[in-house]
Each structure stands twice: as structure tokens, then as C-alpha cells.
Amino acid sequence: MTILISGSGIAGLTLGLTCHQLGFPFKIFESVEKIKPMGVGINIQPNAVRELFDLGFEYDLENIGIKTKEFGTFTKKGLKIWTEPRGKLAGYNWPQYSVHRGQLQMMLYNRLVNLAGKSCVCTGWKVRDFKDINSGISVEVVSENKKEKKFETGSVLIGADGIHSRVRKIIYPKEGKPIWNGAVLWRGTSESKPFRTGASMVMIGHASQRVVAYPITQTNKVSGKAIINWITELKFDPSKGWRKEDWSRKVNSSEFLPKFKDWKFDWIDIPELINNSEDIFEYPMVDRDPVKKWKKGKSLLIGDAAHPTYPVGS
């Protein structure tokens, strides 16, 4: 019987590809009408790269990202504290990659629909409710655009629908909203000359004010520049709350840039990186308390729906 999946983010698409590889029938429901590349940079650690290689993405990852060579921490004056190698250079059997999240998502989506057909991802439909039945699970899905609803039957329902998971909310109806820890992150990408090894990830500053930066593309041989992903972080009083737990809220740099105006070093210029960005996204650093189980009956959770975190180094 069919495996039903809620959400076509990184977890949902990877799960769909795994189902196809193993010969299990599946169907993904995605609330948006059209899947578009969203987000900024992320790091894919060697244990995750191993799974993507197994799905046949070894050459694709090389085309959309860059192998991370080094991680380093630095003071707010730009002085080195610690550096260490990453990926194969650190002894792993697989590399670490830095990529644009949107490029990663579209890589997964395009491969999936090429292998299994476009009908395997039902866009414009989202899970509203579900219940276990003798033959598996019955899932109610709705289309707000079409003003329709229908029922799908499968062997299991897997919630891959993120930190605001509808599946998780039904399993744990009293859980409430995600918890904010007082940190706010601003993220963006800009074209700039890469620093240090040319494939280094750096963390600059301290716990209440810091910057993370790393390239997410190969260096252009003509311009000598790469796309650099950057993250700035400031701490606030968590008791006062924040506007919204939303990583895609566009903002102006004036909300945080003054705090980093002097962070100009001989190897990286943080204000320049920020000012050269076309779009800047703001989101609070939120997660949820652990739950005892990621499964109830024939429904279960994966990804941020199961264990949501927003690590500043991602």
C-alpha cells in the first residue's frame, strides 16, 4: 500500500527518492501550488552526504555546491581562535558540502519527478486530518485554491511538514507554538571574493553577537568571486517574544547592520557582505522540546517535524 508523505522539503523529497529506490509506492502532498527554490545556504554533513551519494547525487552536488575544507572560530576583532579540517580532510569517507538550500531542494525535486512522474508530488494539497483504519491510515487532504477536499488511503502517513507541522499538531495537540531562545538571525547571500582556503566556514564573535560565513559556490575563474552565505546573530530578551517564527521574512539591513559596522578585517568585510545582498531574511532561533515518540499508530514524523532545530552554523 502507498506511503503518504506530508511536505516536499528536503526530508520529504529525500524520503520519496528512497521509496522509489526501494520500490515502495508513495505520494507526497505539498501545500504550495508551485515548488520554487527558497532559502539561503546550508551545510550538508558527511553522514547526510553519504545518503545523497547512495541516491546517485555525487556529481549533482559537485555542480550545485562546494566541498567545505575548513571550519574556524574567530574573535570579534577577526583574530583566529581555532581551525579544523572538514569532510574527507578530517578523515570521513564522504565530503561536507555547502550549498544553496533552494538549489538542493530543486535538485531533489527534479530528480524525483523525472524518475517517478509529476503525479507523485501533489502540489496545492495539504493534510488536514487523519485516522488509523484496519487497512492502514485514512488521510484528509484539502486544496484551499480549489475549495476541495478528498481522502487518501495509505499504509502509513509520514509528516515531513516542518517546524509548523500539521501532522505533529494532530499527534500532540497541546504542544503549543515553537519556543524562542532569544536569538534572532539575519541571513543572506552576496557575491564576494572567498576567504582563507576559498572553501572555509567561519564563525566570528561570541555567544550574543556573531557572524557565520561560507561560500556556497565554486569560485568564478573570471571574476575571482563566489556566492557567500552569511548569517548574523544577536541576542534579545526571550520573555518579550518576537514577531514570528518565520525564516522567510524579508527585512532591511538597518535593523541589525549598525551592530556589525566595524567588523572589517583584512580577510573578510562583513558590512560589505551584508550591503551587497539582494535579499535579507530574518527569523528567530526557535525549536521545540523533545517528545517521547515520533510515532503514533500509523503516523510518524521526520525532519523538522520530529526534531526541529535552527543551528546557527547551518
State the predicted function of each range.
Residues 35-36, 166-167, 309-310:
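Catalytic P-loop NTPase motifs of RecA-like helicase/translocase cores
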Residues 165, 185-187, 209-212, 306-307:
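Histidine-centered metal-chelating micro-motifs
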Residues 2-3, 45-172, 176-189, 240-242, ...:
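Conserved N-terminal helical subregion
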Residues 123, 135, 207-209, 281:
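Short beta-strand or tight-loop elements
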Residues 82-105, 142-152, 191-279:
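Conserved FAD/dinucleotide-binding core of flavoprotein oxidoreductases
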Residues 5-32, 158-159, 186, 255-256, ...:
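Conserved mid-domain beta->alpha element of the FAD-binding
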